């Protein structure tokens, strides 16, 4: 059985191409993929996803990572409680997302799907600090995106 998703979507910046239903679909696909992978052992995920502009993205990245620029996605993982509920917050900086999509020759939607999946996996405990963990996370992201007919973002 697939884990249940509770997703709160917040718009710090208007982005009509990224409606709640689309973000929710991508997040659920990531949650389902993580459940199949077996690393994320949760029955439920309570996540927030906030779309922000350049200034807020930069402020958050500086406050939490001491880097004075806006990054594409920030994730705050809060772990899984004893009842199996994973919690986390995901922040996607829309101007960085749009710029990267253009630079990489991707559609905004495909890149947004990738960043959403990436953020959800981080919220579930995946990381890419060690090379082995990075390979596992990237392979899972690619498999999830392939299931949505989105090309391998790492190719």
From Swiss-Prot:
Organism from which the protein derives = Bordetella petrii (strain ATCC BAA-461 / DSM 12804 / CCUG 43448)
Descriptive protein name: Endoribonuclease YbeY
Question: How does the cofactor bind to this protein, according to its record?
Answer: Binds 1 zinc ion.
Q: Look at the named UniProt entry and state the broad enzyme category this protein falls under.
A: hydrolase
Say yes or no: keyword Cytoplasm present. Answer: yes
Task: Tell me the gene name.
Answer: ybeY
Family the UniProt entry places it in: Belongs to the endoribonuclease YbeY family.
Task: Please list the GO terms describing molecular function.
Answer: metalloendopeptidase activity; RNA endonuclease activity; zinc ion binding
UniProt keyword Nucleotide-binding, yes or no: no
- Please give the function described in this protein's UniProt entry: Single strand-specific metallo-endoribonuclease involved in late-stage 70S ribosome quality control and in maturation of the 3' terminus of the 16S rRNA.
| Residues reported in the UniProt entry to bind Zn(2+) | 118, 122, 128
Listed A to Z, the keywords are:
Cytoplasm, Endonuclease, Hydrolase, Metal-binding, Nuclease, Ribosome biogenesis, rRNA processing, Zinc
What biological-process terms (Gene Ontology) are attached? rRNA processing
Q: Which cofactor does it need?
A: Zn(2+)
